[in-house]
C-alpha cells in the first residue's frame, strides 16, 4: 500500500471510528459542495468515501450548492440524513450551522481538513480521543481559573476570568473533526486590548462581500466585557475598521461592536501553507486550530458572530501557568497533561513536531497582501 493511501485510511479510521463512534456495516452520508466551488479539495469527499467503503461502511453522496447566507438547516437535508447512521460535512454548510440548536439526534460531523494533505497529515491522523481529552482538560482548567492573562508580540493585553460562566459557554452542536479548539470563553468578565494585524475577516457564519477588510498597520481594539469600546492606531485603519463593522452589522441587522467570545487553537498539526490572502475564506475556515492563533468572535450577539479578530503567537497565562507561550501550547503544564501525552502517543508526536505555517506574510505577521 502506498504511504499516502495508508495515511488516508488511518485518517478515515480516526474520523469514522474515533470521532463518529461508527462500526462496519453502518451507513454514511457525505454532504459535499460542487467540485468547482474551490473551498474544499475537489477530491476530498471521494478519498473519504473510498476509504469508508474499504472499512465496511455503506456510503451515499449528498451534493449541495453553497449558500453564502444560509439561515436554517435545509429541510431536504434533514430528511435525507435520517436514513444514514452518520452524516459527514465536506461542505461549508456544516460550519455555517455549527451552532444551530435544531440538529437532528444523529451523528453529524464537520470536517475541518479542507484538502487531502491536511487529512493525511498528523492533523487528521492524531488520535481524536486524545485531542478530545485535551480539550476537556483545557476547558476544566480555564473555567476554574481565577485569572487568565493574554499577551502577544504585537501588543495584545487582556485579562479576566470565566468562572461561573460554564452554563454560558457555547459549543458547536455538530462534532468537529479534527478537534482543534477548546470551548469558546465568553468575554463577559474580560477586558483589555487586542492587537490586530493584516485584516479583519469573516467567521464562516455568513459569506458577505467584501469578506475581509485590509489594515496597513497594527490596529488596537479595546474592549470591556461584551463590548468593543474603542479603536486605536492609524487613522485610515480606524476608519476602515469602523466602516466594515457597520457594513456587516447593517447587512444582517446586528450589533456591530458586540464581542461574544474567544478561543485559541489546540491542534499543533493544523497547518495553512499558503499566505492567507491566497484565499481569505479558506484561511478563516481552516487555520484557526493552530495554537499560534487566538480568535475572537465579534459583530453580533451570537456565536460565532460575523467578524473575527486574530492574534498571532499568544501567551495565555492561567493562574500564573503559561499554558500557551509565544504560540506554543504546552499540554504538559495542565494538571493531567503528562498523563494524556503518555496515554496517546500520536498526541505527543503532534506536540513534539508542531506545524509552523499559519498563512503569515513575508514580514512574519498577518498581511492583506
Predicted ranges, named:
Residues 197-199, 224-228, 233-236, 265-269, ...:
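Histidine- and/or cysteine-centered catalytic micro-motif in compact active-site loops
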Residues 206-207, 233-234, 273-276, 306-309, ...:
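Short conserved micro-motifs at the rims of enzyme active sites and ligand-binding pockets
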Residues 75-91, 240-254, 277-290:
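A short, hydrophobic/aromatic-rich structural module that often spans a beta strand
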Residues 1-218, 224, 255, 321-327, ...:
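Active-site bordering "gate/hinge" segments
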Residues 208-250:
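Long, well-ordered mid-to-C-terminal structural blocks that present hydrophobic/aromatic surfaces
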Residues 193-195, 220-222, 230, 263, ...:
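Structured core elements
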Residues 287, 292-304, 309-348:
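Mixed-charge (polyampholyte) low-complexity IDRs
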Residues 253-307, 311-313, 356-369:
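Cysteine/selenocysteine-centered motifs that mediate thiol-based redox chemistry or coordinate metal-sulfur cofactors
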Amino acid at each position: 500500500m502506498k504511504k499516502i493511501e495508508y495515511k488516508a485510511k488511518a485518517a478515515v479510521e480516526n474520523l469514522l471510528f474515533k470521532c463518529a463512534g461508527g462500526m462496519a456495516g453502518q451507513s454514511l452520508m457525505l454532504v459535499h459542495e460542487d467540485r468547482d466551488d474551490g473551498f474544499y479539495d475537489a477530491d476530498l469527499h471521494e478519498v473519504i468515501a473510498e476509504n469508508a467503503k474499504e472499512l465496511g461502511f455503506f456510503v451515499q453522496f449528498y451534493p449541495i450548492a453553497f449558500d453564502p447566507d444560509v439561515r436554517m438547516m435545509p429541510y431536504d437535508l434533514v430528511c435525507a440524513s435520517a436514513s444514514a447512521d452518520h452524516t459527514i460535512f465536506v461542505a461549508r454548510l456544516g460550519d455555517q450551522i455549527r451552532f444551530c440548536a435544531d440538529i437532528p439526534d444523529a451523528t453529524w460531523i464537520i470536517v475541518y481538513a479542507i484538502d487531502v494533505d491536511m487529512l493525511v497529515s498528523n492533523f487528521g491522523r492524531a488520535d481524536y480521543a486524545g485531542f478530545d481529552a485535551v480539550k476537556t482538560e483545557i476547558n476544566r482548567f480555564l473555567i476554574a481559573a481565577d485569572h487568565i492573562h493574554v499577551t502577544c508580540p504585537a501588543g495584545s493585553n487582556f485579562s479576566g476570568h470565566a468562572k461561573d460562566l460554564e452554563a454560558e459557554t457555547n459549543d458547536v452542536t455538530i462534532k468537529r473533526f479534527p478537534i482543534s479548539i477548546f470551548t469558546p470563553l465568553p468575554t463577559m468578565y474580560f477586558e483589555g486590548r487586542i492587537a490586530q494585524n493584516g485584516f479583519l475577516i469573516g467567521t464562516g457564519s455568513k459569506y458577505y462581500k467584501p469578506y475581509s477588510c485590509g489594515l496597513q498597520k497594527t490596529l488596537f481594539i479595546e474592549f470591556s466585557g461584551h463590548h468593543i469600546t474603542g479603536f486605536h492606531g492609524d487613522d485610515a485603519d480606524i476608519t476602515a475598521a469602523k466602516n466594515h463593522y457597520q457594513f456587516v452589522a447593517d447587512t444582517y441587522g446586528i450589533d456591530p461592536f458586540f464581542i461574544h467570545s474567544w478561543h485559541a487553537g489546540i491542534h499543533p498539526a493544523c497547518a495553512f501553507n499558503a499566505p492567507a490572502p491566497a484565499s481569505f475564506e479558506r484561511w478563516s475556515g481552516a487555520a484557526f486550530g493552530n495554537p499560534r492563533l487566538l480568535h475572537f468572535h465579534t459583530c453580533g450577539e451570537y456565536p460565532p458572530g460575523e467578524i473575527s479578530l486574530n492574534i498571532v503567537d499568544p501567551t495565555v497565562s492561567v493562574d500564573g501557568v503559561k499554558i500557551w507561550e509565544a504560540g506554543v501550547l504546552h499540554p504538559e503544564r495542565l494538571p493531567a497533561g503528562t498523563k494524556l501525552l503518555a496515554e496517546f502517543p500520536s498526541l505527543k508526536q503532534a506536540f513534539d513536531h508542531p506545524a509552523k505555517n499559519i498563512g503569515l506574510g513575508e514580514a512574519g505577521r498577518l498581511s492583506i497582501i
